[in-house]
A protein has these predicted regions:
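Structural signature of hydrophobic alpha-helical transmembrane segments
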Residues: 1, 45-59, 105-118
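The first (N-terminal) embedded transmembrane alpha-helix
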Residues: 1-6, 19, 23-27, 147-148
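Small-residue-rich transmembrane alpha-helices that serve as helix-helix interface/gating elements
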Residues: 115, 165-179
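Helix-coil boundary and interhelical linker segments in multi-pass alpha-helical membrane proteins
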Residues: 38-48, 94-108, 153-165
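C-terminal ends of transmembrane helices
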Residues: 4-14, 37-38, 63-77, 122-133, ...
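Small-residue-rich segments of transmembrane alpha-helices in multi-pass membrane proteins
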Residues: 24-33, 81-97, 139-153
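Short, structured motif recognition centered on aromatic/hydrophobic residues
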Residues: 23-27, 34-40, 111, 115, ...
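Ordered, amphipathic secondary-structure segments that act as subunit-interaction surfaces
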Residues: 59-98
Length: 192
């Protein structure tokens, strides 16, 4: 729901129609996990197995569109940052978990977490005709997911309970992203 909300808000900011809003919300919610499933050769895709996720995102889209129209809600870029940070943490943890369950090495699991966490937002931005925030915003984004992913892997290999690894990954990822936004941390830009 967190990434779907960020997709929905970005689509609303771009003033897309109802179909466009739903498409962008679905891409943001399921794009990274679908790419992960493709790379891990897992079929059917997670959202095909769990159709309640599809219904949940659709319900979120309908409710949000009704709420935003009735309230004349203006979506700012800042409003998108927090649902996006939460989605980044949740999806990173989920991606790492799926890869470890598929018996992938730690480094592959971290990369699958990174892909799951980042690429839904990349697809969201591309469809909205933007350079993906993950690539242009010099405040750490993928780096936060990378650190959170390694936190999960480290706890996994010390036989910590799964919920502890998931929660730690979430806290590290979202916490680092929040610090990066609050303190305006910047990664160096590539100079040609």
């Amino acid at each position: 729901a967190a990434f779907a909300l960020s997709g929905l808000m970005e689509a609303a900011r771009k003033r897309l129609d109802a179909v466009g809003v739903c498409v962008v919300a679905f891409l943001a919610a399921f794009g990274g996990g679908t790419l992960r499933d493709l790379l891990l050769d897992q079929r059917p895709f997670f959202w095909v197995q769990h159709t309640e996720m599809l219904w949940g995102v659709l319900a979120l889209c309908v409710m949000a569109m009704l709420f935003m129209r009735q309230r004349h809600f203006e979506v700012t870029e800042k409003a998108i940052l927090w649902p996006d940070a939460l989605g980044l943490g949740l999806f990173t943890a989920t991606g790492v978990h799926h890869a470890l369950q598929a018996l992938m090495p730690g480094v592959v699991a971290v990369l699958m977490g990174l892909i799951t966490g980042v690429f839904g937002g990349v697809l969201r931005d591309m469809v909205c005709n933007e350079i993906p925030t993950a690539f242009k915003d010099h405040r750490p984004y993928a780096v936060c997911a990378f650190a959170g992913g390694w936190t999960y892997v480290g706890l996994w290999f010390t036989d910590a309970p799964g919920w502890v690894a998931l929660l730690a990954c979430l806290v590290v990822t979202v916490g680092l992203r929040a610090l990066a936004l609050w303190r305006n941390w910047q990664l160096p830009a590539w100079r040609a």
